Amino acid sequence: EQANPGWVNAAAVPEPTQRPLAHYHRRMLIETLDTARDLGRLKEILGVMVRHGFGDTVRRLGLADRLERAGQVLNWPHAAELARLEPPVQVRLALEELGPTFVKFGQILAGRADLFGPEWIAEFEKLHSHVPALPIDALRPQLREDLGDEPEAVFAWFDTAPLAAASIAQVHRARLHDGTEVIVKIRRPGIADTIEADLRLLVRLAALAEAELPTLKPYRPQQLVREFARSLKRELDLAGECRHAERIAANMAPLGFIAIPKVYWAHTRERVNVQDFIDGVPGSDLEALTPEAGFERTLLAQRGAHAVLKMIVEDGVFHADPHPGNVFYLPGNRIAFIDFGMIGRLSQRRRDELLQLLLGLVEHQPQAVADVLLDWTGDEPGVQIGQLETEIEAFVDQYHGVPLA
């Protein structure tokens, strides 16, 4: 379990009518599931939790008895076998078994080093590469419907072996009739219905967990799940991903060193898109960035920071999933970003506040940093403002005099 930050006093977090509230959310969960016919999926999720050592959490949520009455007998002895594994491994294995929605959730958590220690991040990062691809025959009916013909007829060449696979879609290489090398990104058949059902469950489970497990309240599980649900639903639209890519490409054009794949709209739909194939050094292969290969790591770092700051602070529209698999390094010390299924947006006010926070870091103004953070979090119960300000001052000391970019 992730330790609370020192400035959050869990004991001070109120538990208003906790039991009645938990009972309400539990009842709403079951009633909603019965209506949506999702009870079987709930039993599957909780069964996986039990097998991976989280049976106590199921009991504390008050769902074990209900499942047994519904005919699902939880096999508690299995939990002991997997309980010998480290908690991060248990969670990662559970997410993998639960399928695409939960794999995607874990992939997002891989970028939250502010919430999880390195041992957790290392396990979540494995989720980026542990998604099995579907055979091409499982994709053909959907492809014929979206492209109007077999992919071998639409393209001059189509590779039936996948180049990459992710939780929502998989990618195949192809060649247009004019010789352009492209990738064809294909949404997994049936994935939209699966994700929609899982999100209904997650929303209700988050509400129940927040009511029944007060130590989770500072982490705002309901808000986290709602934001995840909105983002994931948008990511299902592969044409929407391409619109995001074109917008960010236009914003990045003045820099001259950022590459965004071109979109081929004639073959792009909600369930399939076609973009330029990017041939470069993957973001995970830093050892390949040598002077002999024509790369300057310092320059790449500066350009990457410049691009990210421009997206966030100046443009207010940014790539929200920039893990190493979505970044490539190109000749001429250029940087390519791919996969714009997840983007973030910041209002002008938020951008101004973020700039205030960054300037507070480099100009050694801990009070300015604290003011922004407290404004963002609101008047949260249990926050020890004095201790928070002390820790921020110690943190700001590390960056005193460091250039912003």
How would you label these PLM feature ranges?
Residues 24-170, 196-221:
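N-terminal accessory/targeting segments that precede structured cores
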Residues 31-33, 37, 55, 59, ...:
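Helix-rich C-lobe and terminal helical cap/extension of kinase-like folds
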Residues 125-159, 242-254, 291-310:
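A short, contiguous, amphipathic alpha-helix enriched in charged residues
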Residues 170-176:
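Conserved ATP phosphate-binding architecture of protein kinases
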Residues 177-234:
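ATP-binding glycine-rich loop module of kinase domains
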Residues 223, 229-243, 247-249, 260-294:
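Conserved structural core of kinase catalytic domains
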Residues 321-323:
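Conserved catalytic-loop position in the HRD/HxD motif
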Residues 325-329:
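Hydrophobic residue at the +6 position relative to the catalytic HRD Asp in the kinase catalytic loop
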